[in-house]
């Protein structure tokens, strides 16, 4: 049986009501990336950053996985260990839909961790009323468990191994702008995978698909 690896981006969650980053009316409109999605921005103004991510977390709780999320779950149920899913999304909709072999490379909106002792928490365990939530263990500042610009994504070693060994690489709803994910298709093709792109608009890395 062929091994299938899927990569999803913000476009797959648009039908659920999650606004995509770069569309008109998207989450980045009227906000500077460096202010709300960088370590430097968090150091400058943690209140602003937490305000942004509390809004995103609340939005993610108000929506449901859509038919595209469910289709990938069914594909996984059919293929078993021959299917794996990488997502750039942090909305947790794949996990809520039932995806098991899942790599959330940019983190999760429902998680945070202490900047000092590194203790991880689910958002539902935390008191989000303060402008800047604090660690229950050491009292220091918590930050959203999100990979910001300039930080290293999660699971890169595991993802590289999957890219080297997949037969089919499926790309769904991603702009092909954000690296390293935008370069995954090149790695997959280099190691012989067939690549399939599903997107409403031509992604920036279309030449490699």
Language model regions located:
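Conserved catalytic core of sirtuin-type NAD+-dependent deacylases
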Residues: 1-209
């Amino acid at each position: 049986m062929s091994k299938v690896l899927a990569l999803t981006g913000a476009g797959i969650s648009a039908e659920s009501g999650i606004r995509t980053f770069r569309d008109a009316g998207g989450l980045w409109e009227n906000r500077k990336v460096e202010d709300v999605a960088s370590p430097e921005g968090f150091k400058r103004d943690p209140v602003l950053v937490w305000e942004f991510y509390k809004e995103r977390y609340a939005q993610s709780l108000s929506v449901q996985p859509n038919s595209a999320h469910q289709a990938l779950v069914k594909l996984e149920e059919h293929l078993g260990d021959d299917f794996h899913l990488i997502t750039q999304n942090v909305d947790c909709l794949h996990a809520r839909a039932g995806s098991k072999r899942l790599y959330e490379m940019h983190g999760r909106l429902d998680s945070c961790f202490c900047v000092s002792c590194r203790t991880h928490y689910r958002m539902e365990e935390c008191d989000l009323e303060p402008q800047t939530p604090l660690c229950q263990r050491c009292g220091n500042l918590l930050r959203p468990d999100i990979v910001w610009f300039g930080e290293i994504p999660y699971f890169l070693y595991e993802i590289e191994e999957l890219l080297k060994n997949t037969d089919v690489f499926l790309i769904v709803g991603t702009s092909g702008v954000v690296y390293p994910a935008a370069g995954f298709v090149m790695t997959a093709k280099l190691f012989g995978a067939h690549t399939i792109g599903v997107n409403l608009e031509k992604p920036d890395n279309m030449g490699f698909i």
